[in-house]
Amino acid sequence: MKKRYIWLSLILILSLLLNVACTSAPVSQNPTSGDSEDLSMTVSGSETDYYSYLTRYRDVPAAAESLSAELVEMSSEVTAISVAEEMGWLFSADSTVTFRVQVPEKAYYHLGISYCYTLEDTRNLPYSLLVDGEVPFDEAENLQLKRIWSDEGAMTQDKQGNDLIPQQQCLQQWQTVQAADYAGYTVKPFRLVLEAGEHTITIRGGQGLILGQLVLDTQKELPSYDALQAEYAQQGYQKVTGADVYLTTQGENTFQKSDQTIYPISDRSNVATYPNDPVVVRRNVIGGSAWAESGMWISYRVQAEQAGLYCLTVKYRQNESIGMAVSRNIYINGEIPCAEFENMVFPYAAKWTQFTLGQGGEPYYVYLHEGENIITFEATAGALSDILLDVSDLAAEMNSLYRRIIMVTSTNPDTYHDYYLDREIPDITQRFATLSARLAAASQQLASANGVNSDKSAILLRVAERMATFAEDVNEIPDGLTSFRDDITVVSNWLMECRQQPLQIDYFTFHAKEYSLPSANGTFWQRVGFAIRRFFATFSSDYQSMQDYENGDNTITVWVNSGLDQAQIVRDMSLKFTEEYGINVNVNVVQGGLVEASLAGNAPDVVIDCARGQPVNLASRNALADLSQFPGYEEVTGRFAQDAMVPYTYNDGVYALPLTQTYLMMFYRTDIFEEMNLKVPQTWDELLEVSAVLQRNNMTVGLPYTAISASGAVNLGVGAKDLYPTLLLQYGGDYYNQELTETMLDSSAALNAFKTWTQFYTQYSFPLSYDFNSRFRTGEMPLAVASLSMYGILSAAAPEIRGQWEMALMPGTPQEDGSIDRSGGASGTAIVMMDSAKNKDACWKYMCWFTETQTQVDYGTRLENLLGASARLASANLEAFHRLNWSDAELAVLDAQRRFVREIPELPGGYYTSRCIDNAFRAVVYQYKNERVELEKANDTINRELERKREELS
């Protein structure tokens, strides 16, 4: 026990020393801008990231003057173009433009980029930055340039009086920005250190980017507030006076913004938000989680009848990131007026708060000229930037140390075995001690930045204590290895949460000091009256139905077979369809129950997000309309992959249009593959070779397997549940004969594929059940096959490994001609028309509209805006898929794999196919039964059920 106290005391002293060395000035209501960036801590994670780059060049001074860069070279795909009377260079896929600059002496510069873009796409513009032909640090490989967006027209209401989300439009305007990390771990633009002499700077970008000039900028110092006031006095500017002098701008009335995700939202929790209504939806505030990433900005137009110096008060709320202050840069007419308006801190506020910018009880004054002024609020990490950078490095170090430990102990160590970790990893004690000290220091810095000890600082302190325990006694590590892995996840989640800077704004007001601000939350009796009205309104609200119109011949009913968020988006978008076609649409959210509704005569007209196995089952009972009989069918199906209609075809009729199409991809950790000198496997034999290397180091490979359930057997189909369809197709087999009357699981191809599939688990010990997200993040599973939808989950939930993983083509089977067959099945959802629909022509028009490119792009964009990257739409519309937020490199590999996708037919009774194959698999893997016997047994059972089903339906 005494030894433990000594260790903790030493670590606490070290953390205090580190804190003194690296903690920025405590954040007050008016943090001052500083040029210094904290570089004093030892970097122990990646050696090629921006943090390490800053450390190496910490003593390099800022440049004395700016430099213009001269264009010297461009790739052949780049063309000259004029936009708004300015010349630029239009990029196509993977284009480069190179500039030359002469540097007088060694210094660091910020890179200013002038750019515009075409309007054919709505994605942010990815680019890479190279200096002298090399990427200077990891973050420079994956950067983004933002577009400019605005609301398209004034807010409109639906038939019930609810405000609708305004359509977002992309504006084609030139911008000049400084290169920075879009992930938001740094506040300031990148520092590019250049030696004296000639250098080249290359921008590598993709489709739609229009590049203007590059400028190497110097570090610009903002004046202090006192210096600004002195300048105002010199200009003769006067403070406005009078209790009735104020200019209020509602937060929802934006001018322009950086992201289409930022749109008005509704708050009915407070009577004082304006405008408000206890019954209908009023989109009366803006921000929150949709305005949380560093670099996101919103601008407003403020009309000032009188020029002068105004106070600025913002009515805001920050109740999403508990206990955390957030920061914003505030621009007046394109400029941050003084250092105090950079990284302006908005303290944690669970309730709406009137926040007057100022210090020591005195407000700040800023100048507005007569007429229109542009006010911009930009999200920034503020004082958290250095902490985020350091904790990001610590997460990388924890991951690295964990992987090194499991190479010795495995992921399930024997707690009674002495692994001699201090001999196998000589610096392990020092590494854990340093981790503990740095985590404790980060916890203290965070508490200082927020002004209080929040749960976020407590999390870091708890992890620091465990690291101290391991440093004190390495024999505690095997027993605590699971806790260590959990700590890595905790720190990674901490990073993901703390980089968010959510802020909601109801309105902001420029005013004279004498102006009396209204209450942020209303009076007691106002709140009581509003709450009572809200309570009684709940009795008349139907939260499942979004019915806007009376039922009739010109009205169709659409069911959305997913969530309420998706249904709300469909409903809002359907109003545009009604405007265009004059057909009314009522939308309901319903999960399941379609067969029952059909039998009861209460079926809808159209169903969105119908599960893969449902259309053929319903069509076999004459419940669906044959879409191939409608005009324009061939043109509509041209939007999809060639065989996308196969799962929805029955007896020469087609009974659904595909909405989504998902298939398997291979995911791998590029950093671990580089460390271990591994190549991405192209075939299954190569995958087994990689697996052998990983398993020798106590890592593993993940292959998809989902235990069958009753609903899964009926709904999900067989295409991408597990690896068997992939292997079967690659081995030259098929599930069914050409007449679709029997299975072909008695073929040699089917048996060989089945043996290969089961042997992954019986001979090579691949895990059947695992948490892919967690294991991939920690590096335990650096290679895995998963649905392409996993891309969005990793992008949203694993920021600490950003840039350290990629998608690749599926492993394949070599062919006699030397090619590799990477065939695989697919899954997805569809849109169907019920045969009971009275106005089938109207339903067909709706289905055509909903599956067309622009509608799918709008739907996918709104979905991702609302729910994040994890909800990215895998649209079956090929053009729409290309216009969603994928990079060119990602699209290239996704398109390449899609060309190998072979859709598998769905049959009445097909649920027995997946169930029986799964039973055979489990018998072999769990009970060590013979593969041939079990597969033949499954084949006979399936064929009997298919025959029984045909007789029943005939």
Where are these regions (language model features)?
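Extracytoplasmic "Venus flytrap"/periplasmic binding protein-like
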Residues: 573-643, 647, 671-682, 782-783, ...
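Extracytoplasmic/periplasmic solute-binding protein
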Residues: 650-659, 664, 688-742, 749-750, ...
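Hinge/lid segment of periplasmic solute-binding proteins
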Residues: 539, 543-548, 612-665, 688, ...
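Extracytoplasmic/periplasmic substrate-recognition and gating elements
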Residues: 105, 306, 798-871, 899-903, ...
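Long, aromatic- and glycine/proline-rich binding clefts that accommodate carbohydrate-like moieties
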Residues: 810-812, 861-919, 923, 951
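Glycine-centered hinge/linker elements that transmit conformational signals in sensory
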Residues: 739-769
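Extracytoplasmic
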Residues: 23-515, 826
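Short, well-ordered beta-strand elements
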Residues: 551-563, 583-588, 606, 655, ...
